[in-house]
Amino acid sequence: MDTYTVSFFGHRYIDNPLAIDAALDDLIGTLLRSKEYVEFLVGRNGEFDQLVSSAIRRCKREIRDNNSAHVWVLPYVTADFRDYEDDYRAYYDEIEICNSAGRHYKAAFQARNRNMVDRSDLVVFFVERQEGGAYQTMRYAIQQDKQFINLADSLEEHK
């Protein structure tokens, strides 16, 4: 089976969630319809991550649920994960703990992000500012010559 891997990164706080939601629905729907199997790699550290996971679940329910995996990639195990592991396992198709777990917690996020980029055929960003972890990850994806989309650019064009 041919697996197409997509990872998502964006700012923690989002000003226009409805426009991003629509763009995510279009992109995820297109991927589900056109690819044999899609692995969606996500985090869970802010509003963009929540929008992405909601869009993945919605599109899988409405379009196709037999050719994808919704994978939460954690940089390390948290107390919250331990306390609610059963709930998280019910929400995501798979949960991975990145091998960055032994690093300092701030460095672990960037190590996890780079691992996700390295695995991806497509990297989707929502980066409006030239600062923060999502921006650093976008710079890394560009350096690695990864195919990427910055949804902030496409939303800016439609204003």
Predicted regions and their residues:
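Acidic/glycine-enriched connector segments
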Residues: M1-K159
